[in-house]
């Protein structure tokens, strides 16, 4: 039992979520609310990052489950939170803040794919927007010699203010220079490049051809090195494509295996059957249960080499795992005469010798809501005992 569920609610998962479920939830939400895509959702992005940072760490998660957010803030497991952008970059392969300072930003894009795409392989063309160095000014932002050191911050890009917080006590506050927006240099408006307006970069449309190999998995990353955002003086970042698999109507993927449920009738469970299955590469395979091979409700069987292709070994495949659900006939489907005949064909049932000490009882259908109603009525009854309702008072003379 967890103390609170706030972090789980932020990620939209249950408290018993697996690490894979946490990763999938974070991936979708982080891409949706990233500041580059949603500039007004900075606080939401921060909450998502904090929730994932705690729940992805087994020690922090255990501490949170026992003591809630307060236990994390008190530092019982290395308290405090990392930068949301660092968490994002580490998750998507960006390398963290130090590497980000030497390179342009990575562009991360989620690509929706089907299970058929991952089974057969596919090629998709994807149009993206990215920053490129302005070719008109060659990334200077203006005319040659027009760029000058910002006199306000002396080229550091940062301002330092001293704030007195008490007698003999001062606080040093560092913030981005408003004059140069943190660049450490400025360009006179008349000398700015007309193409990029002094920003040194422009937005450009990029068409990528994304090759999805057989056996790739949900959440797998395809990286286009050096194709990300460009910035003057920095190496270009990467474009990272993250595969997001849609749910399939029939099959569920479990590693290299495919899992499915199959309904069969009672006669098929007892007497055998043949069932066709349409595969993800548009073949039809037929599974056979021979007469005399009893298939019980909940039995699990498999077909070898009919699962997912193994990544980079596409001629090898996992298993197709099938769980059988036996559908029983409705009450009264046989007349008494035929029922008697069926009984003679089936294995003999064990008769119970009744004694006088035994009580005869009757089976009825179970109603799961009945207990809830009884529980509710019981609470209401107890409440009446503790807080009697006021009735009409008899007048006494």
Swiss-Prot record:
Zinc fingers classed as CR-type: ranges: 121-205
Tissue specificity statement from the Swiss-Prot or TrEMBL entry: Detected in liver (at protein level).
Compartments, record wording: Membrane; Cytoplasm; Microsome; Mitochondrion
Keywords: Acetylation, Chaperone, Cytoplasm, Endoplasmic reticulum, Lipoprotein, Membrane, Metal-binding, Methylation, Microsome, Mitochondrion, Nucleus, Phosphoprotein, Prenylation, Repeat, Zinc, Zinc-finger
Annotated residues for binding of Zn(2+) 1: 134, 137, 193, 196
One MF annotation (Gene Ontology) recorded for this entry: C3HC4-type RING finger domain binding
PROSITE patterns reported for this sequence: DNAJ_1, DNAJ_2, ZF_CR
Region (Disordered): 352-397
Cysteine methyl ester PTM sites in chain numbering: 394
Membrane topology of this protein: Lipid-anchor
Propeptide: 395-397
Listed Gene3D superfamilies: DnaJ domain, Heat shock protein DnaJ, cysteine-rich domain, Urease metallochaperone UreE, N-terminal domain
Domain J span(s) in chain numbering: 6-68
UniProt protein name: DnaJ homolog subfamily A member 1
Organism from which the protein derives: Rattus norvegicus
């Amino acid at each position: 039992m967890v103390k609170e569920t706030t972090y789980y609610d932020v990620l939209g998962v249950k408290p018993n979520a697996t690490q894979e479920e946490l990763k999938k939830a974070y991936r979708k939400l982080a891409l949706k609310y990233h500041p580059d895509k949603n500039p007004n959702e900075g606080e939401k992005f921060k909450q998502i990052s904090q929730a994932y940072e705690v729940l992805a760490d087994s020690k922090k998660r255990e501490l949170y489950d026992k003591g809630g957010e307060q236990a994390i803030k008190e530092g019982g497991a290395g308290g405090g939170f990392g930068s949301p952008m660092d968490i994002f970059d580490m998750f998507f392969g960006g390398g963290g803040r130090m590497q980000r300072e030497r390179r342009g930003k990575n562009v991360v894009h989620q690509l929706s794919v089907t299970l058929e795409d991952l089974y057969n392989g596919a090629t998709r063309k994807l149009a993206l927007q990215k920053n490129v160095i302005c070719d008109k000014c060659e990334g200077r932002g203006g005319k040659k010699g027009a760029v000058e050191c910002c006199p306000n911050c002396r080229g550091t890009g940062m301002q330092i203010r001293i704030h007195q917080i008490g007698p003999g006590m001062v606080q040093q506050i560092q913030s981005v220079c408003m004059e140069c927006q943190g660049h450490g240099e400025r360009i006179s408006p008349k000398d700015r490049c007309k193409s990029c307006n002094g920003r040194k970069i422009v937005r450009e449309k990029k068409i990528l051809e994304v090759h999805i190999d057989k056996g790739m998995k949900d959440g797998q990353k395809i990286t286009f090195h050096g194709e990300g955002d460009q910035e003057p003086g920095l190496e270009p970042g990467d474009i990272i494509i993250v595969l997001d698999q849609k749910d399939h109507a029939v099959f569920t993927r479990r590693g290299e295996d495919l899992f499915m449920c199959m309904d069969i009738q009672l006669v098929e469970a007892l007497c055998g059957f043949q069932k066709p299955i349409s595969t993800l590469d548009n073949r039809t395979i037929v599974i056979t249960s021979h007469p005399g091979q009893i298939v019980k409700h909940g039995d699990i069987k498999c077909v070898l080499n009919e699962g997912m292709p193994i990544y980079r070994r596409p001629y090898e495949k996992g298993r197709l795992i099938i769980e059988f659900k036996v559908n029983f006939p409705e009450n009264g489907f046989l007349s008494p005469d035929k029922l008697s005949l069926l009984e003679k064909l089936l294995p003999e049932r064990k008769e119970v010798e009744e004694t006088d000490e035994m009580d005869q009882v009757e089976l009825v259908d179970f109603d799961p809501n009945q207990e809830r109603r009884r529980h509710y009525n019981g609470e209401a009854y107890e409440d009446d005992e503790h807080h009697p309702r006021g009735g009409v008072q008899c007048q006494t003379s």
